[in-house]
Amino acid sequence: MSLSNQVKIILIETTSSGNIGSTLRAMKNMGFSNLCLINPKKINFEEVKALSANAADLIDKIKFFNSLDEALEDSEIVVATSSRQRKVPWPTESLDDLSPTLISEIKKNKKISILFGREDRGLTNDELQKSNIHMTIETDKKYPVLNLSLIHIS
């Protein structure tokens, strides 16, 4: 099984067509091609294409879902991303610490989904509960929010 089929990037209720395009570009850089969108807001495909650069071939491969459960049906490992601590004390792992585990699971042909939440508020607690792993990406404490298309998963 190829890396592009094993790893699924899931964006929930995306509001920016530019973020979809930029995410496709980052995915292609990392060898991923499986993007799933759950209830995206109105999509401007010209903007998606413009920001995807040389990853425009992935636009036709985007899968659309009405629910997270539907998108996760074939997932064996679900990684939820978050930039903030929650009132519910979920154990978190940094991307650096988690990478060897994910690479090991990929070598075992496991299907992995990586969840990214809404641009304005991230993932809900219910969505986080559907994950096996809660991942944080270390940033400057003064401004801990990353644009999802700037995250390099490797």
Can you say where each PLM-predicted feature lies in the sequence?
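Short, glycine-rich nucleotide/cofactor-binding loops
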Residues: 8-20
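Short beta->alpha connector loops at strand-helix junctions that form conserved
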Residues: 12-13, 38, 82, 135-142
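Histidine-anchored nucleotide/phosphate-binding helix
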Residues: 20-29
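Short internal beta-strands
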Residues: 34-40
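S-adenosyl-L-methionine/SAH cofactor-binding core of RNA-modifying enzymes
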Residues: 47-121
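Short, acidic/small-residue loops that bind anionic groups at enzyme active sites
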Residues: 118, 126, 133-149
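Conserved small/polar residues in nucleotide/adenosyl-binding loops
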Residues: 152-153
